[in-house]
Amino acid sequence: MQKWIVSFLLAGGVLLLLSFVKMDWARAQHASTTRAAVPESAPIPPAQIPQYIRDAVNAADRPATDKSLDAGRQPEQLLAFLGIQPGMKVADLWAGGGYTTELLSRVVGPTGMVYSQNPPFPPEFQQIGQAWAERLKNPALKNVTAVAKSFDADGLLPAPPGSLDVVVMNMNYHDLVLRGVDRAKVNAAVYQALKSGGVYGLVDHSAKDGSGIKDIELHRIDEQVVINEVQQAGFTLVARSSVLRHPEDDRTWVASPRVAGERRGTTDRFILLFRKP
């Protein structure tokens, strides 16, 4: 009897192990083919950009320094592509000085909410941290909650599980690699915070196809690496946009705005839209 029980348990363990192996293999196969299966969409026709997005971007009281970046960042296109709407609860991960945070705040409006997250700022980036803190003092951004928390901390976002509509990370996923952050933990936290059907939007400077993370010091990352890692968290890639593509960029120079100088805003960038099932 005991031998039968042991044999049964061993057989069950083998079957369970095989099921996990099969699931991981399926995920790997899915991740390796998804990019090709999701063609990039063309820019959204201006007439199809919602008026509330145009109003937010063109608001007279937006900072002039923000507006000077618009041509290189195409915020109307990005916000429309991500489906940002009034009343939504959203998060801006690694918000930096708050350019994207303010746009999100203006679009979601008084019935919406924005979590603006930044990790601790090292000494050389204290000026950005100060700009972020100063921006959030604006009464017009009272729907924004500042989240000063390391990516490795538990409870990255204070939002209740399954409560957010959209999470955005704008040109900073590569920095997770540079700082040695546990990206699987970050993506899992985003997955937990989003509601079913919620969107995870990622924009970043592209490295050459197939380069993986070897060019990370250029502040660039291979698009497929991001796709694979985010899908491993359970997300499905549903859309890609070409609006920030710059084929003239040979992807050999440092994309960081602190180094790019006059070339800032001209990097070849991918925009990925993932959805939580």
Model regions and ranges:
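Conserved class I S-adenosyl-L-methionine
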Residues: G87-G96
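Class I SAM-dependent methyltransferase Rossmann-like catalytic core
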Residues: I53-L79, Q85
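A short glycine-rich, Lys/Arg-flanked "PGG" loop and its adjoining helix->strand segment in the class I
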Residues: S105-R106, D182-S196
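A short acidic, Gly/Pro-enriched loop at the edge of an enzyme's catalytic core
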Residues: L156-V167
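S-adenosyl-L-methionine
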Residues: Q127-P158
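Conserved beta-strand signature within the Rossmann-like core of class I S-adenosyl-L-methionine
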Residues: G197-S206
